[in-house]
Amino acid sequence: MDTSQVRILPKLDISAGHNFTKPSKRINESQDVAEFLSSKAYVDLMTFLLQLNRSLFPTKLPDGRVLTWELNSEAVEYSAPVRQLQQLLSKLEAILDEAPPDTGPRRFGNISFRRWYEMVESRAASLLEECLSKEILQMPSSDPGAPTAEVELLAYFLGSWGSPQRLDYGTGHELSFLAFLAGIWKLHGFPENSPGVEERAIVLGVIQPYLELVRTIIKRYTLEPAGSHGVWGLDDHSFIPYIFGSAQLAPAISESDRIPEEGSLSDAPAPGGVTKANVVERERKHNLYFSAIGFIYDVKRGPFWEHSPMLYDISGIQAGWAKINKGMIKMYNAEVLSKFPVVQHFPFGSLFSWERDPNAPSPAADAHIAATTRRTDEASTSSYLYSPKYIKATSWSYGSYKGALGNISTRWTGSPWRFYVCRPYANESSVG
């Protein structure tokens, strides 16, 4: 596949004129999710996610050598915008000292999180001005009465840290941070570079530090999971480290290769290593997937299969990390982007538009489908994301599970996404 055909999130054509607008809520009921999945915002978010995902696959050089992209890799160079975002995260971490956890009795999250969030909210504009370029923040609208780009970036930035009302954090907040970075990308905030170079720096230099800060916040203020499936969800709070971390351990690719669907890097730890504390402790310093697993070990007690059954099931997959990566992207579509409790608070402006994408298929006749997604393979045609699949989760039936935790007695043998039933459009083949 020609690298020119790899989909990249388009940047704004400033010369063509553009009007920014304050992002607002558009997903008010479950039926609105289908509209979201046909929107320009959905396409842009998935394009950026897949763009970042591809950059984390090990790189096969023409001379046969393989470059891997571990956490803290010296081979990854951080551009000035990435370093500025790192400074932004450091400033947010410093504000934690100004809001020590409340020592009084509580049933759920610590109310001091509200104080921390209020401080961040009151300083957000100045923080962005200190750490982002003026050209980005003050990019004007064509209409003199319309706001600058700052109003849109600010909305996604503030949506990235959890809910001060509910004292929770979840994948919807994680999605908001992804949108914040994608918005900067669309505004030409990251430099032009060779394919994958800046994307890797964004993941390893910004997203991973963001995840680490969020984990500190969760532990410090005992934030509840937001929009979680409980024990039957992948993770209480995050999803994207499992996508990017599995990519880090997949087979190496050249610039012209398609993303592999099976296999692993030759010296990658086995997926089953997540159940072994010593392996997790060793690998969490190098890999996003194991870093996320390590946080689970930090905050949960008891057998891994009991508190993280979905991840335990995935650990038994024999087809390698590329298979896991593919499944994670499917699951992200179905369990994050297609779930009303997760995306209901995502706001839409001009950078992430509620407007229908011209390549989107007609809405499904069945408005009550529980989860809706589209094929996420890299594509070389204008129909990139539009091999539409409507996916519905069947009842969970793992091993001898009967509906209560105590009834699990056998290790599951299938990948969790095999329990999604695909109903393809027209003559489209079903998701693999």
Swiss-Prot record:
Its EC number is 5.2.1.8. It is an enzyme of class 5 (isomerase). It catalyses: [protein]-peptidylproline (omega=180) = [protein]-peptidylproline (omega=0). Its main location: cytoplasm. GO terms for biological process: autophagy; DNA repair; G1/S transition of mitotic cell cycle; mitotic spindle organization; regulation of transcription by RNA polymerase II. GO terms for cellular component: chromatin; cytoplasm; nucleus; protein phosphatase type 2A complex. CDD domains: PTPA. InterPro entries: Phstyr_phstse_ac, PTPA_C_lid, PTPA_sf. Pfam families: PTPA. One of its GO terms (molecular function) is peptidyl-prolyl cis-trans isomerase activity. It is found in: Cytoplasm; Nucleus. Keywords: Cytoplasm, Isomerase, Nucleus, Rotamase. PPIases accelerate the folding of proteins. It catalyzes the cis-trans isomerization of proline imidic peptide bonds in oligopeptides. Acts as a regulatory subunit for PP2A-like phosphatases modulating their activity or substrate specificity, probably by inducing a conformational change in the catalytic subunit, a direct target of the PPIase. Can reactivate inactive phosphatase PP2A-phosphatase methylesterase complexes (PP2Ai) in presence of ATP and Mg(2+) by dissociating the inactive form from the complex. Belongs to the PTPA-type PPIase family. This is Serine/threonine-protein phosphatase 2A activator 1. It comes from Emericella nidulans (strain FGSC A4 / ATCC 38163 / CBS 112.46 / NRRL 194 / M139) (Aspergillus nidulans). The lineage of its organism: Eukaryota, Fungi, Dikarya, Ascomycota, Pezizomycotina. The gene is rrd1.
